[in-house]
Amino acid sequence: MRVDLFDFELPTESIALRPAVPRESARLLQVTSQEMDDYHVADLPNLLQEGDLLIFNDTRVIPAYLEGKKNQARISANMIKREGLRQWQAFVRNAKRLKSDDIVDFGQDVSARVVHRNDDGSVLFEFLGNEPVEILLERAGNMPLPPYIAHKRPADQQDRQDYQTIFAEKEGAVAAPTASLHFTEELLQRLEEKGVKHTKVTLHVGAGTFLPMKVEDSDDHVMHSEWGQISAETANAINETKKQGGRVIATGTTSLRLIESAADETGLVHPFSDETDIFITPGYRFRVIDGLMTNFHLPKSTLFMLVSALMGREKMLAAYQHAIDTGYRFYSYGDSSLLLPK
């Protein structure tokens, strides 16, 4: 499928650099097969039904962005994937200045050795010392903000709170499951009072979620893989909801992709603990998901193709144009949408 069919023009001023405060005050565009309506995330208890099941991703973002020096050369590195007890792959600015066995000093008594530089420009680092790498990153790292924010401003202490969901428990993500950023404990309580239940899965979001498709046809795109887990308890909750006639609504594309990866052809969800590289494009038959809450995505991205698969390309292009025209804020810190195909 031609990637340029999923392109649209987005004004720079539509990109949110900070989240809405309070979180649930973000705007929410509800899109159904019949219409589009403007709400706020705080309206969710009135938009969802008793018996619905929301799925949240409980991954925790690690402070994976590091700035350091090799001699006098400034080096910035985004850790993207763990490769061993002390080794991480990283996207590196000024990677050409690095060679095998170079030592990069990231400050705060944190340094790493260059194992090798990969053909794609990424670098494999091995962190020195005996302290767990998680402690080193917590001490010296910053939140790995998406490129479209990081190019406008550096990460700061506020991002350590803003770029983490209230469900964050299991460390491993280098990007936030951003649809869940809109939820507060108070909103969850109101949803529970309405009879809307929720459960959690884990998918450690990788930096590949921000990579543009560099091909003209989606058939030629190599999808990044991410590790995810669905417990037997969560699988049972999803299957029971479907059995009782309730709707399963994924909060975020990460939850959706994981659930669809764990479902068999009959729509039954099984416990899951593995990598997934599922790539959902128009024509895909959804096995489980009845709806999706998700932020607004980049043009020509795998995630815009995913929402187009759920709702239809023309409808999503029209919805995004409405969002742009009426001042919705886009991307990770932006507003959200509730997509209900039936």
Swiss-Prot record:
Catalysed conversion reaction: 7-aminomethyl-7-carbaguanosine(34) in tRNA + S-adenosyl-L-methionine = epoxyqueuosine(34) in tRNA + adenine + L-methionine + 2 H(+)
SUPFAM superfamilies: QueA-like (SSF111337)
EC number: 2.4.99.17
UniProt pathway: tRNA modification; tRNA-queuosine biosynthesis
Example of a GO cellular component annotation carried by this entry: cytoplasm
UniProt entry keywords in alphabetical sequence: Cytoplasm, Queuosine biosynthesis, S-adenosyl-L-methionine, Transferase
Top EC class, one word: transferase
Coiled coil: none
UniProt KW Transferase keyword: yes
InterPro entries, sorted: QueA, QueA_dom1, QueA_dom2, QueA_sf
Location(s), subcellular: Cytoplasm
Biological-process GO terms, alphabetical: queuosine biosynthetic process; tRNA wobble guanine modification
Pfam families: Queuosine_synth (PF02547)
GO molecular function, one term: S-adenosylmethionine:tRNA ribosyltransferase-isomerase activity
Subunit structure: Monomer.
NCBIfam families: PRK00147.1, queA
Family designation: Belongs to the QueA family.
Biological role stated in the UniProt entry: Transfers and isomerizes the ribose moiety from AdoMet to the 7-aminomethyl group of 7-deazaguanine (preQ1-tRNA) to give epoxyqueuosine (oQ-tRNA).
Annotated protein name in UniProt: S-adenosylmethionine:tRNA ribosyltransferase-isomerase
Organism field: Zymomonas mobilis subsp. mobilis (strain ATCC 31821 / ZM4 / CP4)
Gene (name only): queA
